[in-house]
């Protein structure tokens, strides 16, 4: 199963809320529901939300390319996807993970190529949350600020 063709747009203008929503709903939520991948649509649009070929007239691209200067702006969708795509490699498998802490949502993966593990956590609570990451007989503490997203990778 692939989660495809979701897009942000001018209707969702609060950057931090958008980042949290994308990570919670798409990166963590879809993959916890066994989606093999998440695709946002459109990848690149200009500052006028174009080119426009029908459908959503004010969708936002993962990146915005200025039609005059060519400058590229990485949008919140880019950073949400980056939390996974930089660390979760092709052929990685989702592995069991739990948080047990109100407001923290997470998903974990094992990379097939090197056996490394990746844990993505988003804090949807209105306050910081202390947490302890445990893997086997090893652990470390971490405090995740309200609305924050973090990615851990270890061997």
Question: What do the predicted segments below correspond to?
Answer:
Residues 1-155:
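Substrate-binding and catalytic surfaces of secreted/luminal carbohydrate-active proteins
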């Amino acid at each position: 199963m692939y989660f495809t063709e979701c897009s942000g747009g001018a209707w969702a203008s609060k950057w931090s809320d958008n980042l949290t929503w994308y990570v919670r709903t798409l990166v963590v939520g879809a993959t916890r529901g066994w989606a093999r991948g998440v695709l946002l649509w459109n990848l690149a649009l200009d500052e006028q939300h174009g080119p426009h070929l029908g459908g959503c007239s004010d969708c936002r691209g993962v990146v915005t390319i200025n039609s005059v200067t060519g400058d590229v702006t990485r949008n919140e969708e880019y950073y949400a996807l980056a939390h996974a795509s930089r660390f979760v490699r092709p052929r990685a498998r989702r592995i069991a993970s739990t948080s047990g802490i109100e407001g923290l949502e997470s998903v974990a993966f094992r990379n097939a190529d090197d056996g490394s593990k990746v844990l993505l956590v988003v804090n949807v609570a209105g306050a910081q949350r202390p947490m302890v990451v445990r893997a086997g007989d090893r652990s470390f503490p971490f405090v995740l600020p309200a609305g924050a997203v973090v990615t851990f990778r270890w061997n």
